[in-house]
Curated annotation (Swiss-Prot):
Entry's family note: Belongs to the connexin family. Gamma-type subfamily.
Biased composition (Low complexity): 373-396
One Gene Ontology cellular component: connexin complex
Subcellular location, principal: membrane
Species annotation: Sus scrofa (Pig)
Statement: the UniProt record of this protein carries the keyword Amino-acid biosynthesis: no
Gene behind this protein: GJC1
Keyword Glycoprotein found: no
Spans traversing the lipid bilayer: 23-45, 76-95, 176-198, 229-248
Protein name in UniProt: Gap junction gamma-1 protein
Compositional bias (Basic and acidic residues): 147-156
Location(s), subcellular: Cell membrane; Cell junction, Gap junction
Length: 396
């Protein structure tokens, strides 16, 4: 096993566990693995060679040692470390696999779709100054927002700090984490009970053996019983500490989940769903190609007002055609029909103007001149439209 693999393993455990789990990992590495590897081997290396019995009967000493220690202390603790750490290693492997799969899926989605520039529509006042109709027409134009600026804005936003529990829940690993925690606790309890029944709380200085092939009860003596007793009690304490950390972590997960649910409910009560959207005073923008019409002041509904509205609508249609389809190849096939409708609209407008002027000033000489001028203007406009070379130019 290389150091890089061990470093990667510890980093992943650090990222996918709570702060109580990190304490448990520290206790496992320092007080179990290191202590068993360094202290256990040096204390128990001569446990069988220094096990001496006061008999010369062949095989009696081996049988008595088997009765005294059915399983070596060091091997028992190594087996305990392996089984206790197995649920955590399995959880870690599952977490790495799931997160790598999620990242791979997100990378495929990003590669499938292109990265368009973020566009914002702003009002430009300089374009309005080139027109001569003295009307307020909102002009919109797109503004490109670079992707780097967008990423910088996202990075500048402060993220809430957490101890790992919320990250486990966001990654969908909470159930697996709780299962491995329960399995780890069960292993701790099982090994604690087994250690008590195998070794008790003390290593006695001598052991009385009466098993076959020993001819009678004999006394066997153990080397360094006090040192081994102290080390045995230390291992009891480490096992109890790990068990308490497991219980603490379960309480931490339970109370933390309850607290998060209560906080979410309180936020829902404080911030109703109907008012979750932010209020803004910005003027709503329109997509490209969308004409925003300003609502005019209401005037008295007469034939003249109706004719003016029709004239303005025709003028807006002509301006839109000149803006988006001024080329000859884009003109419709029924151009003559369009010209005929425009002439009819102009004639109706002239008649409405004459009727309106006649209604207001029935005996004024200026009215006659206006009528003659309007008729001459209408004749000129009709003549110009007939003599045109196929373009929709109108003289008024």
């Amino acid at each position: 096993m290389s150091w890089s693999f061990l470093t990667r393993l510890l980093e992943e455990i650090h990222n996918h566990s709570t702060f109580v789990g990190k304490i448990w990992l520290t206790v496992l590495i320092v007080f179990r693995i290191v202590l068993t590897a360094v202290g256990g081997e040096s204390i128990y290396y001569d446990e069988q060679s220094k096990f001496v019995c006061n008999t010369e009967q062949p095989g009696c000493e081996n049988v008595c040692y088997d009765a005294f220690a059915p399983l070596s202390h060091v091997r028992f603790w190594v087996f305990q470390i392996i089984l206790v750490a197995t649920p955590s290693v399995m959880y870690l492997g599952y977490a790495i696999h799931k997160i790598a799969k999620m990242e791979h899926g997100e990378a495929d989605k990003k590669a499938a779709r292109s990265k368009p520039y973020a566009m914002r529509w702003k009002q430009h006042r300089a374009l309005e100054e080139t027109e001569e109709d003295h009307e307020e027409d909102p002009m919109m134009y797109p503004e490109m927002e670079l992707e780097s600026e967008k990423e910088n804005k996202e990075q500048n936003q402060s993220k809430p700090k957490h101890d790992g529990r919320r990250r486990i829940r966001e990654d969908g690993l909470m159930k697996i984490y709780v299962l491995q925690l329960l399995a780890r606790t069960m292993f701790e309890v099982g090994f604690l009970i087994g250690q008590y029944f195998l070794y008790g709380f003390q290593v006695h200085p001598f052991y009385v053996c009466s098993r076959v092939p020993c001819p009678h009860k004999i006394d066997c003596f153990i080397s360094r019983p006090t040192e081994k007793t102290i080390f045995l009690l230390i291992m009891y304490g480490v096992t109890g500490l790990c068990l308490l950390l497991n219980i603490w972590e379960m309480l931490h997960l339970g109370f933390g989940t309850i607290r998060d649910s209560l906080n979410s409910k309180r936020r829902e009560l404080e911030d109703p769903g109907a008012y979750n959207y932010p209020f803004t005073w910005n003027t709503p923008s329109a997509p490209p190609g969308y004409n925003i019409a300003v609502k005019p002041d209401q005037i008295q509904y007469t034939e003249l007002s109706n004719a003016k509205i029709a004239y303005k609508q025709n003028k807006a249609n002509i301006a839109q055609e000149q803006q988006y389809g001024s080329h000859e190849e884009t003109l419709p096939a029924d151009l003559e029909t369009l010209q005929r409708e425009i002439r009819m609209a102009q004639e109706r407008l002239d008649l409405a103007i004459q009727a309106y002027n006649h209604q207001n000033n029935p005996h004024g000489p200026r009215e006659k001149k206006a009528k003659v001028g309007s008729k001459a203007g209408s004749n000129k406009s009709s003549a110009s439209s007939k003599s045109g070379d196929g373009k929709t130019s109108v003289w008024i």
